[in-house]
Amino acid sequence: MKLVLARIDDRLIHGQVTVGWGRKLRPQHIVLASDEVAADAWQSRVYAMTVPPEVKVMVLTVDEAASVLQRPADHGLAGRRVLVLTGTAGDMNRLVESGAPVTAVNVGGMHFARGKRELLPDVYMDRDDLEALRTLGGRGVAVTVQSVPG
């Protein structure tokens, strides 16, 4: 497995991911790690339908995603280009904490919500988000902010 991007984006799969990052990185699989989305069959199907037909989507809980990423050959990902998405910094931190082989994280859209403050355009965080990113950095994970590829 080649992990082409691990991204935090509260919109999960959308145009910037499928068109912007997808065209540049050409993922063959997207692993969407979200306990909330994985528990909702309708949301899972909708996200899976929003990608080009040649891209396979796996909607998993954070723990399931960590397990899959630790043993990619057991899940049909050997030799495949994989993009990982979480909706929150906390979920990405849990993914890494659970053993997912993530060495770099891209922060995409983290939009306004009550209690969050703007750090950059389209990037709003609260203390929990900042702490999760600090923890990732402390684990040696490189953290960058970039909406679309340059």
Question: Where are each of the predicted segments found?
Answer:
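Generic hydrophobic/aromatic pocket-lining and core-packing "Φ" positions
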Residues: 18-19, 92, 133
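Ordered, amphipathic secondary-structure segments that act as subunit-interaction surfaces
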Residues: 58-108
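Glycine-rich, aromatic-bearing surface loops/beta-hairpins
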Residues: 89, 98, 103-150
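Short basic, glycine-rich beta-strand/loop surfaces that mediate nucleic-acid
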Residues: 40, 46-50, 54-58, 68-85, ...
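Short gly/pro/ser/thr-enriched loop/turn and capping motifs at secondary-structure boundaries
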Residues: 38-40, 65-67, 92, 112-115
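A general structural motif
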Residues: 9-12, 61, 125
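Long, hydrophobic N-terminal alpha-helical segment
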Residues: 1-51
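Structural motif
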Residues: 2-6, 28-31, 55-58, 80-84, ...
